């Protein structure tokens, strides 16, 4: 496998590490003139009724988590299928896939080790199931299907306004985390960001009890023309949820060892010139704990 060198320079204190990452491998960037649909074969699986944008705030560091990060999430709600993804995760994943298609080298998304890593979700595709896609760096993009679980929501009498919509609160426990969601019956579509669904209205906000993950709607748009929901027909490692979680654990627990196992060489250097072990950085805070 083609090796690449990644240099990470950072200021080390007893509380955090500030990283500046520079890649020595070429990355193909999508532009207006060359989109993902120009690069990959694709299949239209539904048409979009509504596009909802969310701001995701998350804590990636289980050791301290004083500095939460933010990203954009987009949810395309179709007539049968819902497609939700984190903007930076999907962009990086597709850049790597495009690079692999053109050069035979996967490269690395080391810069994305601080990403939310919640995956790309197709709900009800195939019918009654999730299709979940995770980028696993040197191991490629993992894809698995699972039966759509019913989230045991309990609707309360709490109300508040989100993005101008009157919302009702609901809570549930799901795969090791407790969630509180706010949904609006003004938009009777039973979806939201990530895998969230099953309430009698659009989910406008969701937050974990511990505050590690927080989604809030920032925009709602109804397409003025036909806007297909696409599934990209590219190379995936078809696997199971159990194997994906095991791979994710290895990646987040010790990024250095994980990247080295796929032939990706790198150095980590502090401002004082010392070589630092990447294992010092703990990123393991997966969205699903069980």
Predicted segments with their positions:
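Extended soluble regions of mature proteins
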Residues: 33-290
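Bacterial Sec-dependent N-terminal signal peptides
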Residues: 1-41
